[in-house]
Amino acid sequence: MDPTRGDSRYNLNYSMSSIGLSLADPADMYGNPALGAGRPPSGGLLQNMGGVPPMQRPNPAAGAPPAPQCQTLHSPQHASQQQQQQQQQQQQHQQQQQQQQQHPQQQRGLKRSGSDCYEDHHRSSGGLTLQGLDNVASGAVDDSVDNYNPLPNKKSPPANGKKTKGRVKIKMEYIDNKLRRYTTFSKRKTGIMKKAYELSTLTGTQVMLLVASETGHVYTFATRKLQPMITSEAGKQLIQTCLNSPDPPSVGGGDQRMSATGFEETELSYNIADEDSKDDRSPTSSGNESDDSSDVEMPAEAAEVATKLPASKTEVSAPPAASCSAATASSGHKTMPALNYQTDTNSGPSTSTAAGGGGSADSKYVYSAASIANIPQKMLRQLIQSGHLQVHAEEDGNQYVTIPLSSTAANLIKSNKLTASGSGASGSGTPVKNDASADKPLTIKQEFD
């Protein structure tokens, strides 16, 4: 490339031919190892040329102008300029070394040696003039500043040290923000429904869950045995009655939190056998099929639920009692003792037919001892101590447990007994009290208001 052309990068104060090299002769530049070995770096190039006479070669492309340029190299004024350039170059070199020590990962903008400059024709004269040195120095500072500033932003972590907040413990109090409250309700309602399904599926237990939103919607989940509590008309009325009732006053204080071990277990209980547990997990079993558990448990559960919710005693007690009679009548493979209808008179309790005592106000249903054989005596005593059952002592010394039922439940039991049992129940005229054991076991008796 001819340095005398119009490119400003090659408008130099001297010619490359003054140091014995010509850009038009690449053989001397690359083919002579002696020149390559003895070539000084660009930093000390001008200093070594101070007392050396110039070696000129014929350069037809350069023409005549190199002669006056070579004369200016040996003038005293030019020598002082060379010293100033050398001092400035040394200072800039020291600054670059300091920057390299502080930021070793940044290698851009550093001054290259003379051998590197000769390998690149376009940058061969960049470090030989004051203008070129200024450009290199400014480029080094600019590059270092431009490359240094974005790095802390890319590698620095967030202010909190984490990308997300993670698990945050919230206060167990009412959420005032409506949007947050609705979002929390939706998420936690879905979660608790899923947990109820998992509990019933994994353990085979009966689960019933009811969630009422503040917008008036009711969401429920129930397994097979507990579905009548939600789907039956009595269950729906009970739910609506409870939800429409005013908020009860807090017993333990308004700020009392629900503990992990309290307010969960109730006094309700039921018996379950091996076949009954298999029946629970069978999806094809119907509600009217009888199992090994005693049919007495249904009225007992009805009475206990009625005791828990006295305001809606009629609705809760009626369907279990009706299903109990239906299950007793439809059981074909298992014969349960028939209910003995008993009327209390002035002369003492006497056994009569079901039809004859239908209109008596103080009539009672008494289960025989065989029908309650599956109920543990300990459980009965616990129910008596809790107040769910009532114990009455008769004249003969036997103790009877009575379960008060409403008039609606009594009429249902009487009508079902008349249609299902017929004359079979009237044929059994044996008093139930005579079946009591020697240690006077507890006997369940149903008493109507």
From Swiss-Prot:
Biased composition (Polar residues): 69-80
InterPro entries per record: MADS-box/MEF2_TF (IPR050142), SRF-like_MADS-box (IPR033897), TF_MADSbox (IPR002100), TF_MADSbox_sf (IPR036879)
SUPFAM superfamilies cross-referenced by the UniProt entry: SRF-like
Residue numbers spanned by region Disordered: 23-166, 270-360, 418-449
Tissues showing expression: After germ band retraction, high levels of zygotic expression are observed in a distinct subset of peripheral tracheal cells distributed throughout the embryo and low levels in somatic muscle. Expressed in the future intervein tissue of the wing imaginal disk from the third instar larvae until eclosion of the adult fly (at protein level).
Localization terms from the record: Nucleus
Domain MADS-box: 167-225
A Gene Ontology molecular function term of the record: DNA-binding transcription factor activity, RNA polymerase II-specific
Composition bias, Low complexity: 81-107, 317-331, 345-354
Modified residues (Phosphoserine): S156
Matching Pfam families: SRF-TF
Role played: Required for the formation of intervein tissue of the wing. Acts in a dosage-dependent manner to suppress wing vein formation and promote development of intervein cells. Might play a role in the proper formation and maintenance of the trachea.
The name this protein goes by in its record: Serum response factor homolog
Organism: Drosophila melanogaster
Gene that this sequence comes from: bs
